[in-house]
């Protein structure tokens, strides 16, 4: 049962091959057995899961099943879940129980999906390796010495290890695509505003976007259909029609114009990763697509621009955690200032504190123009690069990450090296366009992802292009040893 994809589970449930309760029990048993190995799930919710599965079985019996009814998943612990701890991977929110459901959680529950639990993540989504979590690092099922990527590392490891057929994630600078690449999964960052951010704990509000993680593009199409849509409770949500993403999955890629940016194949790209990605792009040429070199000249500024804008927005968003209203509160403060200082000092981890300090500095009176304003101006240039390129080509392809998964502890002392893990994904968030990562092979025995970038609200095309690759390859069907 655990080998089936979301689409296969949904079809089997509707055909009566097994019940939602049976499939839910099977995944809960795998979480019990394998979670101690990966540390992917920090809050299992077996009671709620079985109740939701029974309700789904009733819907199926009544002939009221939708395309996702009865299918289990895990939610990244950044999404508020009513009555269930929502920690965001931080000591600051270790005791926080959300009083309401995030829109994404509510929509998928309404679609009949079954929440198995909450997935581990980098603290406040700040990290590329899932090593900043208060609950300890997550291990990559493909190699337990390796990181799963971040910040949605728990979501990625849970799906790769077959603890769940699907997961939600969030992507601020690559946090869905990079862990999907490092764990051999399919992961989609939708267009900014496509998926509601209501109830999704904020890191950098102009960059954050929720999205699905699963093994196939067909599964992502089903999940995005359940997640996407306008929400009046999120001022950045866009009122744009939600198509049936599964309808166009099988379109031919003959004549598709694929742009390959020379900037994504320069210094810093592991030669083996490069070979795998080039071979994947070659598959499209064989399928009748047209490949042309393009240039995205300003994307080389993505890392410095991102590390001004994202920390600036984070320092503002995280100012709400003060030890007064909710979250961690220090013991016996001597006065209000001591309460603020110690609650924040003890409640936040090192990486979060580093980014708050960087962001506060970038926003401070004497430096605002030199840093924050300048970064926003360069961000516009990056966006213009994509707009120009996507007028000439249909999609853009390149590596998702410059290397395969690195070992746990290998980059913790070198923040800049860690930040460069997202060098190919950051520009997509800065521009707000959608990006997809699909499994394209292995290098040094660890998975490699192919990144496919499209125009605003063109997720259907990305999923179609990814699906066509998965029809002629079987990288998405590989299983990590010990998790069969």
Swiss-Prot record:
Active site (record annotation): 76 (charge relay system), 151 (charge relay system), 175 (acyl-ester intermediate)
InterPro entries: Amidase, Amidase_CS, Amidase_dom, AS_sf, GatA
Catalysed reaction equations from the record: L-glutamyl-tRNA(Gln) + L-glutamine + ATP + H2O = L-glutaminyl-tRNA(Gln) + L-glutamate + ADP + phosphate + H(+)
Pfam families noted in UniProt: Amidase (PF01425)
Domain of life where this protein originates: Bacteria
Cited Gene3D superfamilies: Amidase signature (AS) domain (3.90.1300.10)
GO CC term, one of those recorded: glutamyl-tRNA(Gln) amidotransferase complex
GO biological processes: translation
Major enzyme class: ligase
Enzyme Commission number, as recorded: 6.3.5.7
UniProt keyword terms in alphabetical order: ATP-binding, Ligase, Nucleotide-binding, Protein biosynthesis
Example of a GO MF term: ATP binding
Role noted for this protein: Allows the formation of correctly charged Gln-tRNA(Gln) through the transamidation of misacylated Glu-tRNA(Gln) in organisms which lack glutaminyl-tRNA synthetase. The reaction takes place in the presence of glutamine and ATP through an activated gamma-phospho-Glu-tRNA(Gln).
HAMAP family: GatA
PANTHER family given in the database record: GLUTAMYL-TRNA(GLN) AMIDOTRANSFERASE SUBUNIT A, TRANSAMIDASE
Subunit field text: Heterotrimer of A, B and C subunits.
Family note: Belongs to the amidase family. GatA subfamily.
NCBIfam families with a match to the protein in the record: gatA
Name of the protein in its database record: Glutamyl-tRNA(Gln) amidotransferase subunit A
Origin species: Alkalilimnicola ehrlichii (strain ATCC BAA-1101 / DSM 17681 / MLHE-1)
């Amino acid at each position: 049962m655990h080998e089936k994809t979301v689409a296969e589970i949904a079809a089997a449930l509707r055909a009566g091959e097994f019940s939602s309760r049976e499939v839910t029990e099977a995944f809960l048993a795998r979480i019990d057995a394998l979670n101690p190995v990966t540390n992917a799930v920090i809050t299992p919710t077996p009671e709620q899961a079985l109740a939701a599965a029974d309700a789904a079985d009733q819907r199926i019996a009544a002939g009221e099943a939708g395309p996702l009814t009865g299918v289990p998943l895990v939610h990244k612990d950044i999404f508020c879940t009513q009555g269930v701890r929502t920690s965001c991977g931080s000591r600051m929110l270790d005791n926080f129980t959300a009083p309401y459901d995030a829109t994404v959680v509510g929509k998928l529950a309404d679609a009949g999906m079954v929440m198995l639990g909450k997935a581990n993540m980098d603290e406040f989504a700040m990290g590329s390796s899932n090593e900043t979590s208060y609950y300890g690092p997550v291990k990559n099922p493909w190699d337990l010495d390796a990181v799963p990527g971040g910040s949605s590392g728990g979501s990625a490891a849970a799906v790769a290890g077959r603890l769940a057929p699907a997961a939600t994630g969030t992507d601020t600078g690559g946090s869905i695509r990079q862990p999907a690449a490092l764990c051999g999964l399919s992961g989609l960052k939708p267009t900014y505003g496509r998926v509601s951010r209501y109830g999704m704990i904020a890191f950098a509000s102009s960059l954050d976007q929720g999205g699905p993680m699963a093994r196939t593009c067909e599964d992502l199409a089903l999940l995005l259909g359940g997640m996407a849509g306008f929400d009046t409770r999120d001022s950045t949500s866009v009122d744009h029609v939600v198509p049936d993403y599964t309808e166009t999955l099988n379109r031919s890629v003959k004549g598709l114009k694929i742009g390959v940016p020379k900037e994504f194949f320069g210094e810093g790209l592991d030669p083996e990763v490069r070979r795998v990605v080039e071979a994947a792009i070659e598959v499209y040429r064989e399928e009748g697509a047209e490949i042309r070199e393009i240039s995205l000249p300003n994307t080389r500024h993505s890392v410095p621009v991102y590390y001004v804008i994202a920390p600036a927005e984070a320092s503002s968003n995280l100012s709400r955690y003060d030890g007064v209203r909710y979250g961690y509160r220090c013991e016996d403060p001597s006065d209000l200032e001591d309460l603020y200082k110690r609650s924040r000092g003890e409640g936040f981890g090192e990486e979060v504190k580093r980014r708050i300090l960087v962001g506060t500095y970038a926003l401070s009176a004497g430096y605002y123009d030199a840093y924050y304003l300048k970064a926003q101006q360069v961000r516009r240039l990056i966006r213009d690069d994509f707009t120009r390129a996507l007028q000439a080509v249909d999609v853009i392809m390149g590596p998702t990450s410059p290397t395969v998964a690195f070992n746990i502890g290998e980059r913790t002392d070198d923040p800049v090296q860690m930040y460069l893990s997202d060098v190919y994904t950051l520009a997509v968030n800065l521009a707000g366009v959608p990006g997809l990562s699909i499994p394209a092979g292995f290098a040094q025995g660890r998975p490699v992802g192919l990144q496919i970038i499209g125009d605003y609200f063109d997720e259907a095309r990305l999923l179609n292009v990814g699906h066509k690759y998965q029809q002629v390859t079987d990288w998405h069907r590989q299983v990590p040893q010990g998790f069969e």
